């Protein structure tokens, strides 16, 4: 019988694959994602699908904006995934495919995609906040919703959440927190850039 990996095991594997210093501003993100993926790897009713993959890529890319050296960002993502048994190449490919498809999705295409996702995920109903970000990224890429009012966009997110069996209140809260944290990260990076210029 295989021994269940602990969070200490995951962190040890992570540092072996990524033996670099993580800049302080990005450290919290790396730690939170590492812990979250570790917990998800032990959830029997969790399934990694294209919405989750898209959410994970979106969170990582937004919160590692300006990472130096830039080539370390890719290594960081790979290490966070690998140390928890997630395949970074599969996640990248799955995310890229969905984002590419979403750019030409009609309402019918969206409904068909959601129906297929539901069928594929039967028995796997564990919700992660990363799924919420995947939903947000999905609708953000669809031309159908580019010019709509925020209330209409929220209604669509509500409909998608319900169709996937997620509580909209949780999805809405996670998206709202995500957007707020992005803004804080932007401001922090601007302050750092300003301080570097004045030195």
UniProtKB/Swiss-Prot annotation:
Keywords: Coiled coil
Family: Belongs to the THF1 family.
Keyword field contains Coiled coil: yes
Protein source organism: Prochlorococcus marinus (strain NATL2A)
PANTHER family: PROTEIN THYLAKOID FORMATION 1, CHLOROPLASTIC
Protein function: May be involved in photosynthetic membrane biogenesis.
Protein known as: Protein Thf1
Coiled-coil parts of chain: 167-198
Annotated GO biological process: photosystem II assembly
GO CC terms, sorted: plasma membrane-derived thylakoid photosystem II
NCBIfam families: PS_II_psb29
